[in-house]
UniProtKB/Swiss-Prot annotation:
Keywords: Ribonucleoprotein, Ribosomal protein, RNA-binding, rRNA-binding. The keyword rRNA-binding applies. One of its GO terms (cellular component) is ribonucleoprotein complex. HAMAP family: Ribosomal_bL9. One of its GO terms (biological process) is translation. PANTHER family: 50S RIBOSOMAL PROTEIN L9. This is Large ribosomal subunit protein bL9. Belongs to the bacterial ribosomal protein bL9 family.
Amino acid sequence: MQVILLDDVKALGKKGEVVNVSDGYARNFILPKKLGLEATPKNLNDLKLQKAAEAKLAQEILEQAQALAKEIESKSILLKIKSGEGGRTFGSVSTKEIAIALKEQLGHDIDKKKLVLNDPIKNMGTYTVPVKLHPKVTAELKVKVDSL
């Protein structure tokens, strides 16, 4: 019997896959536990429509991320912090400060976890900070650190 899986089933398949199982396994385990549906033409058509809608939504999210990446890369943000002699800062600039400045100056509320900063910024100057907007889209944000 062919079954459309509604949930991941160990050693059988992932959600949305159509798999062949024995009639008894389908009737006694998969169907009663609502782990799958019988693969009727109507259910297969519903699955096809659902996958098409999910693909369209994923494409829209990707396009939004690409548009945001273009906007972020075309602009830069300025951070003013206290500094001592030789351009050394008191403290450091972390992803939290960059995310706050990004929201205030450009109006984009981006989570600090999406900003990739290997080490905190401790000197004055201009830096490029990668921003992971989507698994397939990374933008380069220009951050200028200046003294007060």
